[in-house]
Amino acid sequence: PTDDEWALTRRAALYKLERRTFIPLQEIIYQLLGAGTGPGRGQRQEEEERFERLRALVAAQPQSFLEIQPSHQSPSEWKSAIALFDSMDNYSLPSEKAAVLVEVARCIYETHGREHGADAVGGSGASPQKQPTPMAAADFLPIFIFVLARCHLRSVIVTRHLVSETMITALMIGETGYYATMLEAAIGYIAAFDGAAKAVGRSSGSGSTATSSF
């Protein structure tokens, strides 16, 4: 077998292991993460309700408030990516939710390329091709925050814990790990939102984002 075939086999085995370990413990895990009953449920519920209020405030802001550059703002307001985020509730395994997270990110890039590509004529006889304006990580995060704020996930906080804390470590590599970090950063921004300052990262020049206590 080639290296790619071994990698696919290993990943399939890890997914199977996750399914066998997570499903039997799913109810307990959700209770521990705040989706069930038990000690501390009231406090967790208050924290989540506070977060959802802040998320609604962020969702009410235009793209420009989050310092999404005009060259990156979406005329469709990233509806395709938001719809993908909404579908995350249809999955239970952490790896499945993480896979949706990666698809959301790819959809953002695809939407950007489709909506902001510039016609560029190639060599002799070449037909015009769409050349999207490059999007750096600093450009991506505000868009991701916008999408997260406007999606309809039942519990962003529980989703964050499932992806970041219960997923098999070996699966948290590459794109999955990167966008899980983006999710953490987006939640941190929303949790620290005060409705006044634009604090996605560029305003202070530090490039940092707020951290979340959730």
Question: What are the residue ranges of the model-derived segments?
Answer:
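Eukaryote-specific, cytoplasm-facing alpha-helical/coiled-coil scaffolding segments in long proteins
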Residues: R44-P62, G125-P128, D139-V147, T166-G177, ...
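Acidic, serine/threonine-rich, charge-biased low-complexity segments
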Residues: P1-R10, V121-S127, S206-F214
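Short alpha-helical "patches" and their helix-cap loops
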Residues: T37-Q45, V156-T169
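C-terminal regulatory/linker segments that are acidic, Ser/Thr- and Pro-rich
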Residues: A180-F214
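Catalytic and GAP-homology cores of small GTPase regulators
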Residues: P1-Y109, E115, D119, Y178
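Intrinsically disordered, low-complexity regions enriched in proline, serine, glycine
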Residues: L33-G34, R114-A118, V156-V158, M172-T176, ...
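Short, hydrophobic/amphipathic alpha-helical patches that form generic packing surfaces
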Residues: R20-E27, L141-C151, V158-E165, A185
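Extended serine/threonine-enriched, polar tracts that run as long, contiguous segments within proteins
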Residues: M88-V156
